[in-house]
Swiss-Prot record:
Gene Ontology terms: cellular component: cytoplasm; nucleus
Protein encoded by which gene: PDR8
CDD domains (alphabetical): fungal_TF_MHR, GAL4
Feature: DNA-binding region: 31-59
Protein name stated in the entry: Transcription factor PDR8
Length: 701
């Protein structure tokens, strides 16, 4: 029976028209999706079976009306499900392909279990070596059992011995050149009371003094006379003797080191570099002192770090071999004082590693995987003789300098060079007093020498980065160029102030003795001083021969007269030495930069009695002498080159050549003319007497 014949009430509540028969509306039970697709709807709430199967996000019921809904109305809040699913499938596939093709990346959060797979082996003579996870000794000795122990004991008995060869060290040859016993004792005490040990702390005084009675045999009738050395009791003693001799080189012999002592130290270093059976802490102490002695007493040209790089590489390798990168594990039962000394050795190895490698141009020898900077904590450095402020300063410097050096040597650089310099500038601003305290000698008495040590290395890196950027880009932004000028002037000011402040006038007839203050100055500023001097003059010469895109004219193109270098006060170069703000609207003038540099470095050449004594003392240090002589020679050549440039400009101007619009060919011709003029006016320099040459620049060799 057809239900359409039964009368229905209006669902709208409106009265039915009396003159016209109303249309009936059915109650809609199916969802909108099933009704539109003509599917059998289960009418389940809130989701029917058809919508569940298709994973639709919603199921729409329209009970109050039955007119059709468009796709837009039905799914206006719903994404295209099929398209979303396809996108998800493609993303999953892409991720799988990336994982298959990408280089393995090890997450820091998951600790590498191989790092704990190490073993410490103690040799027959007391030498220690920590072997890593790939060593056969680690794999065979990591979990020892009775049979392995028995094998080790039997091997000690049956192990073939090498043929004995005569020692090449000839230790007793040095006896004839030793000072008296009281002089050695006094020298060692002076070393521990002096400024060098004040920043080292790698051993203690009592241990070194005890070596004198044990190693140096005195005459029975004259206790002041050393007649023999006793090195038979302990394999470490050759390094103990080396430590004592290095202290004597620093405080007694100075640069007048006897050939027997020099030969012994050289032979000991060479033997250590080629030996794996002499791994002692004393060896590391010997290498540290040897490096310091090389820096102070080196006569092998101006410092470029090659003079001591082998010592530092061996020092770093020895630290790792002895387990100094994990002192709390391998030296658990040692006294706290011994642990502090070991931490300081590791402390200096890391510092000299990054400093030397940067000066050489290589990445650090010690990799990040072997380094845990969290050891630089107050808990680990509780000794009253160690200032934790210094420890934190070293920690922060190692963090930023190692990052910079590592990034520079990566195959692909992720950041711009200037970002490295900005990080270092931020480090300097955060960890040091206002820069004016280092560039103004008035404040120097309150400055910790350790601060100068770290600051000078930081300045060296910043100045070199800006220099590298200039070389690569050929044209720098105003702010980068001006900041480079600023750091060059700050750096030379720090170097000069350090030398002047730490110079203590010699007493009585000790003019030829190396003063402790200047020894310290060399340690503090040696890499920085030669870097800044060479960088300033290198940039100056490049400026003279159009290596930069911007031209420089030394004469007025309208009048043909020489342009006088402007006074630096007009650009306020002094303000550059008080902070890190630089002008960004205009380049600092080339002439003003050169004049200010001259004024700063010439302050130690000014004619007065104190400077005369200072330069006399400086002449006893070959490293300082050679660096300052390097500056004097560079200046003479630069002055001659400037003169040649001016004369060439005048000649070209007279010829009517438009010098404001140079082509590449014209630039090449111009440089050739400058060079010819320079060769002509500088030929007298090759025949001048050396002493006369330096004397005219107030530098009496």
């Amino acid at each position: 029976m057809d239900g359409s014949h039964f009368p229905m009430k209006s669902t709208t509540g409106e009265p039915v028209s009396s003159g016209k028969k109303g249309k009936r509306r059915k109650v809609i039970k199916s969802c909108a999706f099933c009704r539109k697709r003509k599917l059998k709807c289960s009418q389940a709430r809130p989701m029917c079976q058809q919508c569940v199967i298709r994973k639709l996000p919603q199921c729409v019921y329209t009970e109050e009306f039955n007119y059709p809904l468009s796709n837009t109305e039905l799914f206006e809040q719903v994404p295209n499900v099929a398209l979303v699913q396809k996108i998800e499938n493609l993303q999953t596939l892409l991720k799988e392909n990336d994982n298959n093709n990408a280089k393995p990346v090890y997450c820091r959060s998951s600790e590498n279990p191989l790092r704990s797979l190490r073993t410490s082996v103690l040799g027959d003579n007391g030498s220690r070596y920590v072997f890593g996870p790939t060593s056969w000794k680690t794999l065979s000795l990591f979990e020892q059992n009775k049979f392995q122990t028995e094998f080790q004991n039997l091997w000690k008995v049956l192990k073939p011995l090498p043929e004995c060869t005569k020692s090449q060290l000839n230790e007793n040859d040095v006896v004839a050149d030793l000072p008296s016993f009281p002089q050695m004792e006094s020298c060692i005490k002076s070393f521990f009371a002096g400024p060098l040990f004040g920043i080292l702390h790698i051993f203690n005084q009592d241990d070194i003094l005890s070596l004198l009675d044990r190693l140096f045999i005195r005459d029975t009738t004259d206790k002041n006379l050393v007649i023999l050395l006793d090195l038979q009791g302990n394999a470490k003693d050759k390094y103990n003797l080396g430590i004592v001799l290095q202290i004597l080189c620093l405080g007694y012999y100075n640069q007048d080191i006897p050939s027997s002592v020099s030969h012994f130290l050289h032979t000991l270093s060479a033997a250590s570099l080629s030996s794996s059976s002499s791994n002692f802490v004393e060896k590391l102490q010997f290498f540290l002192l040897s490096y310091i002695s090389v820096m102070i007493n080196c006569t092998d040209g101006v410092w470029d770090a090659t003079q001591g790089v082998d010592l530092i590489n061996e020092l770093c390798q020895g630290c790792i071999s002895l387990g100094l990168n994990d002192i709390d594990k391998w030296y658990l039962n040692e006294s706290e004082e011994t642990k502090q000394n070991l931490r300081c050795i590791w402390f200096w190895a890391l510092f000299l590693d990054v400093s030397t490698s940067y000066d050489i141009g290589n990445p650090p020898s010690i990799s990040d995987d072997l380094l845990d900077l969290s050891i630089f904590t107050a808990q680990n450095f509780q000794s009253p003789s160690i200032d934790f402020r210094r420890v934190k300063l070293m920690h922060d410097f190692l963090d930023v300098s190692r990052f910079t050096t590592r990034e520079i040597h990566k195959r692909e650089m992720n950041e711009k060079l200037t970002t490295f310099s900005l990080r270092l500038i931020e480090f300097i601003q955060s960890n040091f007093s206002p820069i004016e305290h280092y560039t103004n000698s008035v404040y120097y008495s309150d400055i910790d020498p350790f601060d100068i040590l770290i600051l000078s290395r930081s300045l060296s890196i910043v100045a070199s980065i800006y220099n590298i950027e200039m070389i690569i880009a050929q044209q720098s932004r105003i702010i980068d160029k001006n900041r480079m000028v600023q750091f060059l002037l700050i750096s030379i000011s720090v170097c000069v102030n350090t030398m002047v402040f730490h110079f203590k006038e010699p007493i009585n007839d000790q003019e030829n003795v190396l003063t402790e203050g200047l020894k310290l100055s060399i340690i503090l500023i040696n890499p920085l001083l030669i870097r800044i001097v060479s960088q300033v003059y290198s940039l100056a010469f490049n400026r003279l021969i159009f290596r930069e895109k911007a031209f420089l004219f030394l004469i007025d193109l309208d009048t043909g007269k020489k342009i006088q270098f402007i006074k630096y006060e007009e650009e306020n170069f002094d303000e550059l030495l008080t902070g890190f703000d630089v002008r960004t609207d205009k380049f600092l003038s080339f002439s003003g930069t050169i004049i200010r540099f001259y004024e700063i470095i010439d302050s130690i050449f000014a004619v007065n009695e104190r400077n005369k004594r200072l330069l006399k003392a400086v002449s006893n240090f070959y490293q300082l002498t050679s660096t300052l002589a390097f500056e004097r020679v560079s200046r003479v050549l630069f002055d001659k080159a400037s003169q040649a440039r001016i004369e060439t400009e005048k000649i070209w101007l007279k010829k009517g050549i438009n010098m404001e619009h140079f082509s590449d060919l014209m630039i090449e011709d111009f440089i050739n003319d400058v060079w010819k003029t320079f060769k002509e006016i500088s030929k007298d320099l090759w025949s001048i007497d050396k002493k006369k040459f330096y004397k005219q620049y107030h530098f009496d060799l």
